[in-house]
Amino acid sequence: MSKRDPTSVLLPTVEWGPVCEQLHAVLNEDDELLVLCDTPSDPVADRETPSGVDVVVAGEPSGCSGKANALACGMERASNDRFVWTDDDFDRGPAWLDRLITGSQRHGPTTLLPDFAGGGWWRLAKPALLMLLTVRTLLFERRNSGEAFPWGGCVAFHRDDLETSVDALVSDLRRSLSDDLVLDTHLRGCRRDPDLDATVRVEGSADAVYHRLVRYMRADHVHDGLEPELVLWSVVAVIALLFPLPAAAIATLAVGGALASVDQLRLDAVFAYPALLVLPVVIAMGIVVTDFEWTGRRYRVRAVDDVEVLDRDV
């Protein structure tokens, strides 16, 4: 085991799976793995765990997402000053945790850029989101050179890296939908480690992609407002319709280059032109649609601090 800070690893999940085993296998003696579930009826809730692992029952969310509620509970329970937030939907190698934590010790908050991979309708959605996020970073966001957006599925940071406090972070988590966006407001100077990767498999059915896109866009809209981006991409889509051949060539090359730069599958670039045309519709969904499903719950999001859990087990 490497010499590094004792770390609390927070893993929201309702069952004991391969990721739990992977993380437990690489814990140092003073680390802890907190497996965060929702209710006592979850499969993992009454499981006997090995040394260094505790199951924490966060309870049903109220006014926030289930994941945000679980992470808030985990931050309150954590006994160390360095934290890792991660998800259970991708595999990681034996050196993954050490690299993430030591990177955060040397360079400050550290994250990675995930590859959301899937078939079906996701092949159209992925290049649309890539174009949106790339242009947003260039034109709309105010980040320093080299600063990355912290992805809640893989991020390491120290208590002192927070601009406010753990209590303030927990308070915001308990009234929000997106743990990523909440962490982004509390954690500045995050860097991306290009040698860390995560491939997350995404369901490609029309229904699954619809709810995923609404969740992404609605969270962005209630935090920052999507109207300026809707105007921009509507104009771009009209130009692309008027000049289809050059627009298709430019979009395909741009998306292919962006994917190649982060070692992701470049085949998705062939859908760049149709993705460009539907992007205004995707953005408009985030402005207009308030309800969506996520991991067994239906949510209604009216504002950044107005999150209602409508139903579970949908």
Region locations from a protein language model:
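Cell-envelope/extracellular polymer assembly enzymes that use nucleotide-activated donors
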Residues: D5-L10, E32
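Short, well-formed alpha-helical segments that are part of the catalytic scaffolds
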Residues: T13-D30, P43
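A conserved acidic beta->alpha catalytic loop
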Residues: E15-G17, L36-T49, E60, F90
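Long helical/loop segments within the catalytic core of UDP-sugar-dependent glycosyltransferases
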Residues: V56-C73, I101-S165, A272-V281
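Short beta-strand-to-loop acidic/aromatic patch adjacent to the donor-nucleotide binding site
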Residues: L71, N80-D91
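Acidic donor-binding/catalytic loop of UDP-sugar-dependent glycosyltransferases
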Residues: T86-G103
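Catalytic donor/gating beta->alpha subdomain of glycosyltransferases that bind UDP-sugars
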Residues: F116-G118, A125-K126, A168-E227
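Membrane-embedded multi-pass helical conduit in multi-pass membrane proteins
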Residues: P228-R300
